[in-house]
Regions:
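Conserved loop->alpha-helix
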Residues: 1-96
Length: 96
């Protein structure tokens, strides 16, 4: 299910990929970790970096071309789903 909306804060188009930096709402942001997974508008991606509520992903040209991710511009909102395993781990730690 969708956990919230993330907003594209920065898009860097590089020769062999694009780096997209999003800002996540506070509640689900705590479940986002480097090398973890997020789903943006139904596209499952690996998180590259995390800083506070911001996170970045690296997108290859093929993915940019065949998904809605390629058309995103700064300020656009996307549906955000966080890694379910991160939720389970957090819940386990809370109940200890």
């Amino acid at each position: 299910h969708v956990d919230g909306l993330a907003h594209l804060r920065r898009r860097e188009d590089l020769p062999d990929m694009a780096r997209l930096t999003f800002e996540a709402p506070a509640p689900p942001a705590r479940f986002i970790a480097p090398k973890g997974s997020v789903t943006l508008d139904g596209v499952s991606l690996t998180v590259n970096t995390v800083e506070r509520n911001a996170f970045s992903v690296l997108i290859i040209p093929h993915t940019l071309g065949v998904t809605t991710i390629g058309g995103l511009r700064e300020g656009d909102a996307v549906n955000l789903e966080v890694d379910q395993m991160a939720r389970y781990a957090a819940r386990l730690m809370e109940t200890r």
